[in-house]
């Protein structure tokens, strides 16, 4: 019996901490490292988002300039491309169908 090696149970079960029973319900423990990572502020992200916003604005300006140039060259083509075709006949709304229930209703 002295030669047997005791195997200590690992603190994680299936990569997650074991649940704690409180008030007849099982509640999972939250890891301390996850809480610390969530509250840390990332300063590098703010700088990159400002740069990407400027790049997006410049891209949109270039796009609107090219669309304006095309609109001046081909005004009729651009106008007809954005219009929906008008239907020859308008669809009539179908009558509402009466649902036949073969079982008596609960009152």
Swiss-Prot record:
GO biological process: apoptotic process; cell differentiation; cell population proliferation; gene expression; negative regulation of CD8-positive, alpha-beta T cell activation; ribosome hibernation
Keyword Membrane appears in the UniProt entry: no
A Pfam match: DAP
Expression tissues: Expressed in hair follicle, corneal epithelium, epidermis and footpad epithelium (at protein level).
Signal sequence bounds: none
GO molecular function: ribosome binding; translation initiation factor binding; translation repressor activity
Gene Ontology cellular component terms for the protein in this record: nucleus
The UniProt record lists the keyword Mitochondrion: no
Keywords: Apoptosis, Differentiation
Function: May play a role in the early stages of epithelial differentiation or in apoptosis.
Name of this chain's protein: Death-associated protein-like 1
């Amino acid at each position: 019996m002295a030669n047997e090696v005791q195997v200590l149970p690992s603190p994680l079960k299936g990569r997650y901490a074991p649940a704690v029973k409180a008030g007849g319900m099982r509640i999972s423990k939250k890891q301390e490292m996850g809480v610390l990572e969530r509250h840390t502020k990332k300063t590098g992200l703010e700088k990159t988002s400002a740069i990407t916003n400027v790049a997006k604005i410049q891209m949109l300006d270039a796009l609107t300039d090219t669309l304006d140039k095309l609109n001046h060259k081909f005004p009729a083509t651009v106008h007809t491309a954005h219009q929906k075709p008008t239907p020859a006949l308008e669809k009539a709304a179908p009558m509402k169908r009466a649902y036949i229930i073969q079982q008596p209703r609960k009152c």
